[in-house]
């Protein structure tokens, strides 16, 4: 390949590599979340990254004329297949396919990457890891949804957040659906209304942005136009007034629609069960939470942080929701012969990691390896004998792989890798049956080398790691 045709390395917008400390932190976060899911009685499930497009549904898209516009879809022979955009739709397919063998209620958790063909932004990725927990089956909805709320709060505390650093916002879609009925909004506009409301806390929206989406169109700062729901001024005004209400009692007095009253009662029942536990102060009603996915039809939850983060340019940004979900009574019943309700929630791990790294509150005991320097190639067998002793004693260790490089270059590599100690043995050490260690984290200018009998290797090296 000539110079003119050399490739320029880079990533598509909305994707990132993770390595080193960031990846170790992410794995610790995942392990903490998983341990808490298991503690709450959830069992693991794994499904493929691809699903048949008609099975996964088109619950994400804002553009009705192109229902698969927000996902990555491909032609596979006679069928279209789609990279999963969440873990709930694959769960619905799995339950419909295996419901005879599953214990119901089925409490499952799943961790896996999802893909969305959306506009990228601060802590908004087009590929990200979700950690889901769902309860599927005919159960008491208040109990199941309270279990999810308690799980969210408990997990965030286990991850290292403090009680005043997050809020679990809960609502019920039936409340606003009742208002939509009273306003005689046509069926073809209902999902657009829901998605407009869901944008309320998104950057650049607020009440004004939502009102634009409820009416004819919204033009963002870049000039991009999003078609609105084409409501009348009165319809849009009444929805905006609804979004300003904060008190459940006030809502109960003003909204008399039976469906709205049903949603309010379900919220009251949920809050009563939540009050039996330890997390009532972290769980708040917020009637603007409706969730943008079309399959939710009752309880909704969205968890936000009470602090801002800074992007790579040092500018304060809103992180957005780090955990969300809700109740879906018809997602599974789309499949023939199955009518099973469900409720669930999902942590956006990459967004949560972004927040935790901002706080510097997640610590990792990262055990860097001991490095064995190769001073003389004729003693290579001896170096590998030392390596075996270290690894047999569960000490992270490696041998330098290029014996042609001098000691200085080997130590430069070790320092770049942040190795705590180097084994430096040459002809004298092997003749005297001794080992020399160099403390690579020691104070510069001091004597950081120590020579001792070979049989003391493990005891001496443990002083440095």
Swiss-Prot record:
It comes from the Bacteria. It is an enzyme of class 6 (ligase). It comes from Pelagibacter ubique (strain HTCC1062). This is Histidine--tRNA ligase. GO terms for cellular component: cytoplasm. The lineage of its organism: Bacteria, Pseudomonadati, Pseudomonadota, Alphaproteobacteria, Candidatus Pelagibacterales. CDD domains: HisRS-like_core, HisRS_anticodon. It catalyses: tRNA(His) + L-histidine + ATP = L-histidyl-tRNA(His) + AMP + diphosphate + H(+). Homodimer. Pfam families: HGTP_anticodon, tRNA-synt_His. InterPro entries: aa-tRNA-synth_II (IPR006195), aa-tRNA-synth_II/BPL/LPL (IPR045864), Anticodon-bd (IPR004154), Anticodon-bd_dom_sf (IPR036621), His-tRNA-ligase (IPR015807), HisRS-like_core (IPR041715), HisRS/HisZ (IPR004516), HisRS_anticodon (IPR033656). Its EC number is 6.1.1.21. Belongs to the class-II aminoacyl-tRNA synthetase family. Keywords: Aminoacyl-tRNA synthetase, ATP-binding, Cytoplasm, Ligase, Nucleotide-binding, Protein biosynthesis. One of its GO terms (biological process) is histidyl-tRNA aminoacylation. It is found in: Cytoplasm. The keyword Aminoacyl-tRNA synthetase applies. Transmembrane segments: none annotated. GO terms for molecular function: ATP binding; histidine-tRNA ligase activity.
């Amino acid at each position: 390949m000539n110079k003119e045709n050399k490739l320029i390395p880079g990533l598509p917008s909305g994707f990132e590599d993770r390595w080193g400390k960031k990846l170790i932190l992410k794995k610790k976060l995942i392990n903490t979340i998983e341990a808490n899911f298991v503690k709450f009685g959830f069992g693991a499930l794994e499904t493929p990254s691809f699903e048949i497009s008609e099975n996964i549904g088109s619950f994400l898209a804002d553009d009705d004329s192109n229902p698969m516009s927000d996902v990555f879809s491909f032609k596979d022979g006679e069928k279209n297949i789609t990279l999963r955009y969440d873990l709930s739709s694959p769960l619905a397919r799995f339950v419909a396919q295996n419901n005879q063998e599953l214990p119901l209620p089925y409490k499952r958790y799943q961790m896996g990457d999802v893909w969305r063909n959306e506009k990228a932004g601060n802590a908004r990725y087009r590929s990200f890891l979700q950690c889901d927990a769902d309860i599927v089956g005919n159960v008491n909805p208040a109990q199941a949804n309270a279990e999810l709320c308690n799980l969210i709060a408990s997990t965030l505390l286990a991850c290292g957040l403090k009680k005043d650093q997050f809020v679990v916002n809960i609502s019920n879609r039936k409340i606003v659906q009742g208002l939509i009925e009273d306003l005689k909004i046509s069926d073809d506009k209902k999902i657009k209304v829901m998605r407009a409301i869901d944008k309320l806390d998104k950057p650049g929206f607020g009440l004004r942005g939502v009102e634009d989406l409820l009416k004819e169109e919204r033009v963002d700062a870049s000039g991009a136009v999003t078609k609105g729901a084409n409501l009348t001024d009165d319809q849009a005004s009444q929805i905006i007034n609804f979004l300003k209400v904060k008190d459940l009692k006030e809502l109960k007095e003003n909204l008399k629609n039976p469906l709205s009253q049903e949603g309010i009662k379900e919220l009251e029942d949920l809050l009563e069960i939540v009050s039996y536990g330890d997390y009532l102060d972290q769980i708040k009603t917020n009637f603007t939470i409706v969730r943008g996915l079309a399959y939710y039809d009752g309880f909704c939850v969205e968890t936000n942080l009470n602090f801002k983060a800074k992007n790579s340019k040092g500018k304060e940004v809103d992180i957005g929701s780090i955990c969300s979900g809700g109740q879906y009574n018809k997602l599974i019943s789309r499949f023939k012969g199955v009518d099973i309700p469900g409720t669930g929630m999902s942590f956006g791990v990459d967004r949560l990691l972004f927040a935790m790294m901002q706080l510097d509150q997640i610590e990792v005991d990262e055990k860097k390896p001991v490095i064995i320097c190769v001073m003389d190639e004729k003693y290579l067998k001896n170096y590998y004998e030392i390596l075996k002793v270290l690894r047999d004693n569960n000490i992270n260790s490696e041998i330098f792989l290029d014996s042609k490089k001098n000691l200085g270059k080997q130590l430069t590599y070790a320092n770049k890798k942040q190795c705590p100690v180097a084994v430096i043995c040459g002809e004298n050490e092997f003749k005297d049956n001794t080992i020399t260690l160099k403390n690579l984290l020691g104070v510069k200018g001091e004597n950081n080398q120590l020579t001792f009998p070979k049989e003391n290797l493990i005891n001496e090296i443990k002083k440095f790691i």
